[in-house]
From Swiss-Prot:
This is tRNA pseudouridine synthase A. Its EC number is 5.4.99.12. It catalyses: uridine(38/39/40) in tRNA = pseudouridine(38/39/40) in tRNA. The active site is at 52 (nucleophile). Keywords: Isomerase, tRNA processing. It comes from Parvibaculum lavamentivorans (strain DS-1 / DSM 13023 / NCIMB 13966). PANTHER family: PSEUDOURIDYLATE SYNTHASE, TRNA PSEUDOURIDINE SYNTHASE-LIKE 1. Formation of pseudouridine at positions 38, 39 and 40 in the anticodon stem and loop of transfer RNAs. The keyword Cell inner membrane does not apply.
Length: 246
């Protein structure tokens, strides 16, 4: 059975998340319905990251097995047509070896979080970014973020519902950059814990508005206690940016 790698973009606002659930429509469900509309078969799709409700993607990756070969461009265009009007699109499709797995073959995941830092309400970016009125110091946020880079026990920065066997992860990079009224926080690692990036962002926002210092971030990390975390940032501003493979 030929296997295809799909690079997918979506607006997570109307969905309960990536994974198929019984309480609402998911991105996975829309894709599987689109594939069925194209080929008439119920095929299972496997994603690289299980994004939560309201979280977006510019570079989610998934794989799917077809019973017979299909031209990748035909697959992309036909499934996209069947997914309308849902805000989900296959940007690229390519045939890959059977050994490729979207989740387990990934070597790095890149997430971006967008903060719009201004007094005026959001219009075009409503549901696509976190609006923060109080002026944030992006340089202080970037400096504090470096305390979270490396191999650590991230118990403080994971959801109490996180099902990962270990809270230990290696974060390769966190950068905080300001572009006019927008602050972008980019986090890179092989994998992340549930709510880890949003927990980072909520904590770094506290540094940006002067409520926390880098030292307090360091103490929160060392505490290995969820109660020591800052507020969790809303899902609106989070994007699965890219997934890397060898």
């Amino acid at each position: 059975m030929p296997r295809y790698k799909l690079t997918i973009e979506y607006d997570g606002s109307p969905f309960v998340g990536w994974q198929a659930q019984t309480n609402g429509r998911s991105v996975q469900q829309v894709l599987e319905e689109g594939i069925k509309g194209f080929c008439g078969q119920e095929l299972k799709i496997f994603g690289a990251g299980r994004t939560d409700a309201g979280v977006h993607a510019l570079g989610q990756v998934a794989h799917v097995d077809f019973e017979t070969p299909v031209a990748p461009d035909t697959l992309r265009d036909a499934v996209n047509a069947h997914m309308r009007p849902h805000p989900v699109a296959i940007v690229e499709a390519e045939e890959v070896p059977d050994s490729f797995e979207a989740r387990f073959s990934a070597v790095k995941r890149h997430y971006m979080y967008r903060i719009v830092n201004r007094r005026a309400p959001l219009t075009l970016d409503r549901g696509q970014a976190w609006l923060v009125h109080k002026t944030l110091d992006a340089d202080a946020m970037h400096d504090a973020a470096q305390a979270l880079v490396g191999n650590h026990d991230f118990t403080t920065f994971r959801s109490v519902q996180c099902q990962a066997k270990s809270p230990v992860k290696t974060v390769d990079e966190i950068s905080v950059s300001r572009y006019a009224d927008e602050i972008e926080i980019v986090c890179r690692a092989r994998s992340f814990l549930h709510n880890q990036v949003r927990s980072f962002v909520g904590t770094l926002k506290m540094v940006g508005d002067g409520s926390w210092t880098r030292r307090k971030v360091e103490k929160a990390l060392a505490a290995k206690d969820r109660a020591a975390c800052g507020p969790v940032a809303p899902p609106d501003g989070l994007y699965l940016l890219q997934v890397d493979y060898e």
